[in-house]
From Swiss-Prot:
InterPro entries recorded: IDEAL_dom (IPR014957), UPF0302 (IPR011188), UPF0302_N (IPR014963), UPF0302_N_sf (IPR038091), Virus_scaffolding_prot_C (IPR027393)
Gene3D superfamilies: Uncharacterised family UPF0302, N-terminal domain (3.40.1530.30), Virus Scaffolding Protein, Chain A (4.10.810.10)
UniProt name for this protein: UPF0302 protein EF_1554
Natural source organism: Enterococcus faecalis (strain ATCC 700802 / V583)
Family: Belongs to the UPF0302 family.
Listed Pfam families: IDEAL (PF08858), UPF0302 (PF08864)
């Protein structure tokens, strides 16, 4: 998914003005990103940033997590100056940013910039039981749709007097019902 620079700026502006960040360094870094297009072009908003090769997590107050954390190759850094230096010196590299704030999933501004984390894709994080339930649902839905189509074709065969098609389609419908 491609997220435009203007969408990123719109989100960061909203985040800076709305989310309650207790450490001023968080706001400094977000504002720095906001005012440097070349860097912001390489920023990707993701979840599970700790799984990326280079990412930052910013956390709003009251959520019980470190408010500012840099991850580089599974190592953690909390020093704001070191984090700023990393951003500034490696501005050409992709930077993954996770923003943790209350009701993030109910916020359209956040959802409009959220991308799939290439290091931890969403579809690989689905519980196996949930995946089986989803697969079962789609199989059932496919069978329901197939039965509806067969019934419509049987009706057409009756209306046109096509006895052979009627018998063939009826047999297929009966086989589907027995599954």
């Amino acid at each position: 998914m491609f997220v435009s620079l203007s969408e990123k700026k719109k989100f960061l502006t909203w985040l800076v003005n709305t989310a309650p960040f207790g450490r001023r360094e968080v706001l400094w870094i977000l504002n720095y990103l906001l005012t440097h297009d070349a860097i912001l072009n390489n920023v990707h908003f993701v979840e599970n940033v700790e799984k990326t090769d280079r990412g930052i997590r910013v956390v709003a107050d009251g959520l019980g997590k470190e408010p500012l954390l840099l991850f580089i190759q599974a190592q953690e850094f909390t020093d704001p100056e070191q984090i700023f230096h990393e951003i500034r010196m490696n501005w050409r590299k992709a930077l993954y940013l996770e923003c943790v704030f209350p009701e993030a999933w109910q916020t359209s501004q956040y959802l409009s910039v959220l991308e799939d984390n290439p290091f931890a894709p969403w579809n690989e994080q689905v519980d196996q039981e949930v995946a089986r339930a989803i697969d079962q649902y789609f199989k059932q839905e496919e069978q329901t749709q197939r039965m509806a189509l067969l019934k419509a074709q049987i009706d057409d065969a009756l209306e046109t007097g096509n006895k052979e098609a009627f018998l063939e389609l009826s047999d297929e419908l009966n086989r589907l019902k027995q599954q």
